[in-house]
Amino acid sequence: MKCPFCAFADSKVVDSRPDKEGSTIRRRRECESCSKRFTTHERVEEILPLVIKKDGRREPFDRMKLVAGVMKACEKRPVSVETIERLIDRLEVQMQESGEKEIPSKSLGEWVMTELHAIDQVAYVRFASVYRSFKDITEFMSELQELLKK
């Protein structure tokens, strides 16, 4: 592992442990050149299904794209980055367990909205407003009315 401080190519692992969910491994490393310590988080590379977009295109699942969308919905809300990461981790596990080779973006969006509804209702409405592409204020108000009923 390349040192982020001096760019030396070799480092030794000082400590290694799985995270709480067991999906990543946290490693504490020490550079063999400058002796500075740094942390890495390693994840097993999994083959996730292709996402079928609304227009029929297929593209590989992009975790960072989904994280960015959820983070935008949670902007200035009391939702931690860790909560968002766990939400996306659960989604990836669900995708793996489904065994599907392709999954519609609609299914991913609905699942994220269900999760956000339980975490933060303002973030839910923000995500839904982009995901569902409300055509006018009436559709938006209808969604808010449904939220208030729950």
UniProtKB/Swiss-Prot annotation:
Its cofactor is Zn(2+). Binds 1 zinc ion. A zinc finger (unnamed) spans 3-34. PROSITE patterns: ATP_CONE (PS51161). Transmembrane segments: none annotated. Residues 49-139 form the ATP-cone domain. It holds the Pfam family Zn_ribbon_NrdR. One of its GO terms (molecular function) is zinc ion binding. Belongs to the NrdR family. Negatively regulates transcription of bacterial ribonucleotide reductase nrd genes and operons by binding to NrdR-boxes. This is Transcriptional repressor NrdR.
